[in-house]
Amino acid sequence: MNQANFLQELPNVLKRLETGLIIPQLKDILRVFGLRLSGTKAELITRIKQLIERIAIENNTTSWEALKKAIDGDVTSAVCILKYNTYQIYSAAAPIAPPSSASGNRSYSRPFAPVVHSRIRFRKSPFYDILEQFNAPFVVPACVGTRNTISFSFHVTPPALSKLLNDPKQYRVYLFSTPSETIGFGNCLMEFPTPQMELRINNQVAHANYRRLKGKPGTTNPADITDLVSKYAGPPGNNVVIYYMNSTKSYSVVVCFVKVYTIENLVDQIKSRKAESKEKIIERIKNDNQDADIIATSTDISLKCPLSFSRISLPVRSVFCKHIQCFDASAFLEMNKQTPSWMCPVCASHIQFSDLIIDGFMQHILESTPSNSETITVDPEGNWKLNTFDEPVESSEDEFVPKEKVIELSDGEGISTMANKSNDQPTRRASTHNSGPPAKRKRESLVIDLTISDDDENVATSTTESPSNATKENSLSRNVQSPNIDTAISNRSTNVRHGHPGFKDYTVENSPASRERSTSESAQSSVHMGYAGEGGLLSGALRAPSQQNNNNSNTQHSINLHTIVPSPYEPPLSVTPSTAITNLSIPESNRTNSSASSKSFTMNDLILPPLHLKNTTQTNNAHEDAQSSNLSQNHSLFYERIPQRPSYRIEKQNKGIYEDENEQSISAMPIPRAHPQLPKNLLSQTAGPLWDEQQDAQVDWNSELQSNNSYHNSGFEGTGNTFQSID
């Protein structure tokens, strides 16, 4: 070793050792050289300084280069340097005693060889076996506060590549990582540098879960990079790039070739083991309850797995667990495949896969109970019984098969039930379980049919029910108000006498031919006029004849309609013939008489005095022309006493605002005569005479206002004081 270089590098190494390293990093350095790791930080630094003194005394260049790499954080490079260069270090502080010999008291000093970690041993997992390691452990140094990137490469061996291509489901390529400080001390736990890392294989992102349970190392799985690995052997190999940050300690990364096992394979391995017998478990239960100071009581055991909450199929537990409660093997393995915690779900103790056994007592209970049972009770003597408060779920083996009922809902006929009229009773199917309680009976399902319309009611009723049932249905439909007027008309009496004074008697023939012809017309007119209900004014009079009595179907029935008589002192309203009367089921032979009679009570317009004007109203009915001849005597007297307005004509010279566009004279107001005391010059003023107080005082207004004028129908004549113009 060059002494000049050694003395030049020594101050920087000592400064880095005393100020730039923490306890885990100091332990990594001591672990590389196989020194003791216990003690405080000062003791660890002192131990490393003693190592530097021995290296300088022995002039060991290889150990010095490895120590510098370890102090810089590259523990893997330091291990690789020491791999092919073994040196001997004699420690005076802690010599290693040789093993005692039975032949004599011979003693000797064994030289210490540094630990070279060319292969990392990870904790064994039941889901894979590590067959081959493709690269030496690559160190990922600590990185706090910044982002770091490291890269390395590896080659797949030809035998591994051949197996990988032939059976890719059974053979895979995994990337492992573990803290560097744990190397050389038993099985290493799987742990990535940081959850915020990115792994790239041949410039492709490897999607994996890098997180672990908080405070529980070894609860993550290695990254499966099989699909990203090149499928050929030799250079240039496969490039690995890791981006990470906030890593407080260094890690070692290695790529391995593994053989994987499925959950079915592991379950078969458990079944192949010897199970714990039922008798042995019962004996253990009795022994645990024999203590006189402890009063043992019954224990409720669930038949459901505490992990999947479903019924246990294969009850297993650890051989070291003493509880009766078991869990399902498949659910337990599936949970640990995702997150390898390997904790008992009942007592939270650590479990190894090799410790799992089948519980014979629990397996016997599962085979003896129905599939819908959930809990059992075990007494201190090992006897068990099914809990009676369990309410089993209805299964296909224990159930009733009721026959369906169809309920038809319609607007006119109410509710009618179409059910199977057979007297066959549903029979209970045979049950294969004898120990469980009987299953409940299912509720009978009712099917309601809402697709049947009013037009199909009569057809559905006649095809499915007997005449006696039809009578009951008709009686039920009387209480249901429905737009179907045929049903309502058929259930009413045919002789309807309305006591209203405004209708005149008519005779309507009730014949089968007329009923068939007027069924749709009567329903449409009655619904349109608002007579569907029984409370209408013409509801009783406009109903069709009943069809209940077949013997009296050809008889005639009378409906009394009274004519409205107008009052002589009130202007009568104009009434048009009702469409409901013409649309009734009246024969054609009587329909003419009915229409003629309806004209007699149809009134004319309001009575007005004759103004000698042309009648512009068109008369639609011929009977309105003779209306005035049918008036009563009082009506005529009242008509003659109405005063008539006298007619006037305007002289030819007074044209102006009193003449229309056709130059025809019309009635106008009379021309006032001139006042006797007004001056002539004021007559031409269009605004009227000016009022003068002195002249107005000379006028005798009492005589002017007391003048009597008489009028008669033939013309206009005035008497009394007259006005004369002043010429």
Curated annotation (Swiss-Prot):
Name its GO BP terms in alphabetical order.
centromere clustering at the mitotic interphase nuclear envelope; linear element assembly; non-recombinational interstrand cross-link repair; protein sumoylation; reciprocal meiotic recombination; replication fork processing; stalled replication fork localization to nuclear periphery
Cellular component, GO, one term: nucleus
Q: Which residues carry this modification: Phosphoserine?
A: 395-396
> Which keywords fit this entry according to its UniProt record?
Metal-binding, Nucleus, Phosphoprotein, Transferase, Ubl conjugation pathway, Zinc, Zinc-finger
Record's keyword annotation contains Phosphoprotein: yes
| Residue stretches of biased makeup (Polar residues) | 417-435, 459-494
Where along the chain is Zn(2+) bound? 321, 323, 344, 347
> What are this entry's molecular-function GO terms?
SUMO ligase activity; zinc ion binding
Start and end residues of each PINIT domain? 108-261
Zn finger residue spans: SP-RING-type: 290-371
Q: What class of enzyme is it?
A: transferase
Q: What does the annotation say about its assembly with partners? A: Interacts with hus5/ubc9.
Q: What is this protein called?
A: E3 SUMO-protein ligase pli1
What is the source species? Answer: Schizosaccharomyces pombe (strain 972 / ATCC 24843)
Q: Which gene encodes it?
A: pli1
